[in-house]
């Protein structure tokens, strides 16, 4: 018989919001690892903001890291270009200044994949938090000023 952790992880991975809700309401833990050691938020369908918000509202850990790659859900969302999911994760307390096992920030992954809206959002937040110099030095940007980064004090564009 399949465990509730496996059922919840599978439902989250497939983006089945109603099934995720039913399992959570029935008492399934949003942080219980499945058979493969992954939590629902780690395997969820990244483009499904409703599933992400639902898991987070039931207490899913937005900062859980993969034990092998050290990547977190924000790394996955940034890499795949899911700005809406990234915003929900960040609003739930996900850190944006964490590196994976290869030393990459979520910003690095968004840059590599050309997800410009995600890059703007992350640069804006990191500059607001005073983390731009650390990020810009690593990428050899011209300077750490918002003007140089093209932010000019503007919030990220909304979809």
From Swiss-Prot:
PROSITE patterns for this protein: ANK_REP_REGION
Transmembrane annotation, as ranges: none
One Pfam family this sequence matches: Ank
Compartments where located: Cytoplasm; Nucleus
Mapped ANK repeat ranges: 3-35, 36-64, 69-98, 102-134
GO molecular-function term, one example from the UniProt record: protein kinase binding
One BP term from GO: negative regulation of protein neddylation
One cellular-component annotation, GO: nucleus
UniProt KW keywords: ANK repeat, Cell cycle, Cytoplasm, Nucleus, Phosphoprotein, Repeat, Tumor suppressor
Tissue specificity of this protein: Expressed in spleen, liver and lung. Not detected in kidney, colon, stomach or brain.
Post-translational modification: Phosphorylation seems to increase interaction with CDK4.
Disulfide bonds: none
Family named by the database record: Belongs to the CDKN2 cyclin-dependent kinase inhibitor family.
Note: Down-regulated in a number of tumor cell lines in response to methylation of the CpG island in exon 1.
Quaternary structure annotation from Swiss-Prot or TrEMBL: Heterodimer with CDK4 or CDK6. Predominamt P16 complexes contained CDK6. Interacts with CDK4 (both 'T-172'-phosphorylated and non-phosphorylated forms); the interaction inhibits cyclin D-CDK4 kinase activity. Interacts with ISCO2.
Function: Acts as a negative regulator of the proliferation of normal cells by interacting strongly with CDK4 and CDK6. This inhibits their ability to interact with cyclins D and to phosphorylate the retinoblastoma protein.
Name of protein: Cyclin-dependent kinase inhibitor 2A
Native source species: Rattus norvegicus (Rat)
Gene designation: Cdkn2a
């Amino acid at each position: 018989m399949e465990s509730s952790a496996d059922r919840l992880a599978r439902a989250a991975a497939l983006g089945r919001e109603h099934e995720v809700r039913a399992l959570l309401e029935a008492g399934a833990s949003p942080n219980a690892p499945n058979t493969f050691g992954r939590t629902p938020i780690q395997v969820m369908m990244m483009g499904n903001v409703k599933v992400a918000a639902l898991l987070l509202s039931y207490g899913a850990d937005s900062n859980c890291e993969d034990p092998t790659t050290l990547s977190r859900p924000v790394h996955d969302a940034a890499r795949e270009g899911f700005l809406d999911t990234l915003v929900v994760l960040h609003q739930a307390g996900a850190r944006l200044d964490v590196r994976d096992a290869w030393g990459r920030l979520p910003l690095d992954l968004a840059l590599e994949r050309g997800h410009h809206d995600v890059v703007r959002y992350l640069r804006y937040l990191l500059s607001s938090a005073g983390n731009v110099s650390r990020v810009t030095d690593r990428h050899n940007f011209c300077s750490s000023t918002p003007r140089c980064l093209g932010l000019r004090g503007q919030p990220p564009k909304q979809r």
